[in-house]
């Protein structure tokens, strides 16, 4: 389907991951509704259901085309200029492919692949088709911009622009354009068919799914803890929350056996404590950091099997890796202060502190049950790891 965003015609073609060929009339999927994934706090797994109001694949692709050729044109130019700094002036792609990648809880992201000469530029266009998605998008765009200032460059996607496009029946479809991390994939706890044990599988859509080694798994948990702790503001207690491995908030790439991690979402970035006009005192900030750390040791171990199955609890290797990543991200003085506080707690006291944290931050009843079932061994393992860190920092 050719359109004219600039001087010449540019062909835009549509695809859906998992389906062969291009999607256009009279393809049987063209007029079928988009599925959605919703999470019910009472349920053990996500549920798939049709959208209300109904948005078809045709509605979706037409809205994306309207964005790319209308309100999104300056956003595309900004992205192309960032990706091709050697090119000057306006850059017109030779062609585009729009690939509907997945049906998420909040967004239906499309990968927008543009050919510019010999270069191929991939971007992501996150599209919200529900009220929950729209509300999440407004919060996330603000969060990503603030979090990016605290993280190493390239750790989170750059947002190039946002617009609301009218779909069928004048339904408003908000969407924003951002970086696509090429070669990175979702990962989840999964049962390895070779030995029947639990491992971590990478959904490599370019080749084939594969399982990580234990060393690579530990590196994943270390980097997750490092990025979330770097994003945490100890002065204000601002942090990324909620986040969840089951939602695919982090993605990874393995090169020469080394793991590279990216954070691709930040649904909310807000403080957990509110101080008076003078702000929080040092004791309050230290206690807030303690709560953040202990919650991180729990949440970093939670996933769903294959992303959508039963709640899953990681192997103990995640504990030492989480502790390592956390302390690597902290300034030395703050790390020393927290180690002093943690050193005052015994094994039983650690369980007493973790219990209300698990109750407060558990997102779903099934996850709370999972945490409480594993709380005693988790606390014991965490205590042993902390003793090693405190006495041999």
Q: Residue locations for each model-derived region?
A:
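The N-lobe alphaC helix and its flanking beta3-alphaC-beta4 segment of protein kinase-like domains
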Residues: 133-150, 376-392
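Helical subdomain adjoining the active site within ATP-dependent kinase catalytic cores
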Residues: 5-33, 302-393
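Conserved structural core of kinase catalytic domains
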Residues: 158-219
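ATP-binding glycine-rich phosphate-binding loop
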Residues: 8-14, 18-119
């Amino acid at each position: 389907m050719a359109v004219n965003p600039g001087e010449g015609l540019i062909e835009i073609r549509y695809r859906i991951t998992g389906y062969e060929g291009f999607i256009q009339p009279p393809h049987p999927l063209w007029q079928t509704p988009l599925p959605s994934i919703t999470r019910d706090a009472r349920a053990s797994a996500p549920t798939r259901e049709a959208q209300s109001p109904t948005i078809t694949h045709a509605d979706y692709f037409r809205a994306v085309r309207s964005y790319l050729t209308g309100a999104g044109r300056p956003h595309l130019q900004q992205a192309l200029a960032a990706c091709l700094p050697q090119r000057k002036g306006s850059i017109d792609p030779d062609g585009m492919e729009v690939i509907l990648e997945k049906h998420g809880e909040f967004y239906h992201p499309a990968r927008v692949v543009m050919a510019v000469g010999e270069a191929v530029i991939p971007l992501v266009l996150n599209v919200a088709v529900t009220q929950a998605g729209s509300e999440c998008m407004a919060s996330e765009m603000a969060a990503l911009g603030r979090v990016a200032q605290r993280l190493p460059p390239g750790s989170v996607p750059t947002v190039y622009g946002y617009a609301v496009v009218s779909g069928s029946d004048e339904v408003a479809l908000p969407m924003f354009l951002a970086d696509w991390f090429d070669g990175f994939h979702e990962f989840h706890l999964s049962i390895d068919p070779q030995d029947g044990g639990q491992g971590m599988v990478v959904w490599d859509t370019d080749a084939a799914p594969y399982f990580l080694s234990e060393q690579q798994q530990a590196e994943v948990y270390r980097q997750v803890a490092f990025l979330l702790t770097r994003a945490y503001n100890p002065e204000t207690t601002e942090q990324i929350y909620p986040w969840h491995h089951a939602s695919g908030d982090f993605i990874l790439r393995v090169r020469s056996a080394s793991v590279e991690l990216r954070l691709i979402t930040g649904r909310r970035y807000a403080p957990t404590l509110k101080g008076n006009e003078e702000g929080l005192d040092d004791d309050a900030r230290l206690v807030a950091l303690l709560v953040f750390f202990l919650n991180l040791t729990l949440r970093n171990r939670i996933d769903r099997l294959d992303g959508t199955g039963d709640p899953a609890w990681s192997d103990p290797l995640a504990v030492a890796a989480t502790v390592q990543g956390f302390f690597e991200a902290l300034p030395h003085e703050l790390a020393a202060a927290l180690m002093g506080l943690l050193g005052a707690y015994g094994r039983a006291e650690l369980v007493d502190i973790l219990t209300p944290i698990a109750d407060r931050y558990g997102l779903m009843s099934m996850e709370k049950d999972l945490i409480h079932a594993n709380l005693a061994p988790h606390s014991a393992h965490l205590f042993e790891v902390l003793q090693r860190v405190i006495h041999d920092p």
